A protein has these predicted regions:
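Acidic, proline/glycine-enriched N-terminal capping motif
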Residues: 1-102
């Protein structure tokens, strides 16, 4: 598990064009925490579990920023994602994920 609080999409962009300072810090921290990984070529499936301290957190808000950072770190294109499984768990903040070839 990556021990970082998932960032809400609401805190990622100012207006429609500019990444917030909070997003840039999150991107730097998350990128440093992501493990080395070889992403398979072609169609892929991504499984993600977001762990939140608060049960009221929305499951979909951290998804876009997280996927964008994964793409940047691992060099794949989101058009190659054919399956996406997202789960929410309540506990300590964190993110678990796996990427599989289909």
């Amino acid at each position: 598990m990556i021990n970082i609080k998932p960032l809400s999409v609401n805190k990622a962009w100012q207006g429609r064009r500019f990444k917030t300072k909070e997003y840039k810090v999150y991107e730097t921290e998350l990128s440093a925490l992501l493990p080395p990984l070889n992403v398979p070529n072609g169609k892929i499936r991504i499984d993600v579990t977001f762990h939140f301290k608060n049960s009221l957190s929305d499951i979909d808000n951290p998804l876009k920023p997280f996927l964008d950072i994964l793409q940047k770190k691992y060099g794949f294109n989101d058009r190659d994602v054919y399956e996406l499984n997202v789960k929410k768990q309540v506990g300590e903040d964190g993110i678990e994920f796996n990427i599989y070839q289909l």
